[in-house]
């Protein structure tokens, strides 16, 4: 008798995706982050759903409703901090996942890669709108500053900003719509994740060597299911440790002050996971130029496959490219640090140098070094 998991219309989809899926035998821990992102998304949707049951999206009561969740709702503090720090874990896994793709040449699967970029934008938009909801000082001023950037768009900019705000400033209408979109977007993200996986399973996974692994495949279950479960346990332990021991470590103290349109905080900055892009934005003195650089800092990932000049897919066996890759990582850490600093000397020039280096490495140095490596292969 044929196994039900191979014949049932629903079970056979799950079976071909998570049980009998042929996977390369050489996948390292870097391939764990896709499944970890799935767990993060699940945690965020569940905690967010329960938080939404107690939250009110009104400027008069939003801040107090979050306080009420933490003080009066059973385990409300746990839900709130799991959700806030879960977002941080989400972005850690997201950046490591993208970094893995860059290092091992996974971007050569262009459909999967492009859906991934869409996912990155969607998750960033979701996180930004979520940060506005507690209606603290940094929520209000972050929303004001970031949405106001759209006014740099010629002709339609000002109208666009007022349309997003629902008025002439960030107010009740803005908060209500941000809550609606913050609730909706994770489900759109979930749908995009399914499309992402659909395209991935069309080609099969890449592997650390970058060499086709068709002759050497193993079933996903039990090998990679066990490996993924270990990853879940490590990540959830890290998240629980963060939530239970220092839940406010990655947050901003200013967000415990209720939003006040008449008092500007000394340093307006987004959450840590946006600081690298914020530093690039601030490093350009022109408003429109800054906005374009901000968008390009993420959108540049879309042209990485076009800039691939190496004869080898992965950086595993390339002598020079990994040095540039780790320099890029160092530049991103520098930008993250600069994004959290005030706009003054020497931070301005460090930010500008790091921003130029970021684009230079991806657009020019990586393709050039790859061509040098191709030449070295002939020796």
UniProtKB/Swiss-Prot annotation:
Binding site for heme b b562: 83, 182
Annotated PROSITE patterns: CYTB_CTER (PS51003), CYTB_NTER (PS51002)
GO cellular component terms listed in the entry, alphabetical order: mitochondrial inner membrane; respiratory chain complex III
Protein's membrane topology: Multi-pass membrane protein
InterPro entries: Cyt_b/b6_C, Cyt_b/b6_C_sf, Cyt_b/b6_N, Cytb/b6-like_sf, Cytochrome_b, Cytochrome_b_C_euk/bac, Cytochrome_b_N_euk/bac, Di-haem_cyt_TM
Top-level lineage group: Eukaryota
Keywords: Electron transport, Heme, Iron, Membrane, Metal-binding, Mitochondrion, Mitochondrion inner membrane, Respiratory chain, Transmembrane, Transmembrane helix, Transport, Ubiquinone
Major location (coarse): mitochondrion
Residue intervals passing through the bilayer: 33-53, 77-98, 113-133, 178-198, 226-246, 288-308, 320-340, 347-367
Binding-site residues, a ubiquinone: 201
SUPFAM superfamilies: a domain/subunit of cytochrome bc1 complex (Ubiquinol-cytochrome c reductase), Transmembrane di-heme cytochromes
Residues reported to bind heme b b566: 97, 196
Recorded GO MF terms: metal ion binding; ubiquinol-cytochrome-c reductase activity
Swiss-Prot/TrEMBL cofactor(s): heme b
Subunit and partners: The cytochrome bc1 complex contains 11 subunits: 3 respiratory subunits (MT-CYB, CYC1 and UQCRFS1), 2 core proteins (UQCRC1 and UQCRC2) and 6 low-molecular weight proteins (UQCRH/QCR6, UQCRB/QCR7, UQCRQ/QCR8, UQCR10/QCR9, UQCR11/QCR10 and a cleavage product of UQCRFS1). This cytochrome bc1 complex then forms a dimer.
Note: Heme 1 (or BL or b562) is low-potential and absorbs at about 562 nm, and heme 2 (or BH or b566) is high-potential and absorbs at about 566 nm.
Family of the protein in this entry: Belongs to the cytochrome b family.
Name of the protein described by the UniProt record: Cytochrome b
Organism from which the protein derives: Artibeus concolor (Brown fruit-eating bat)
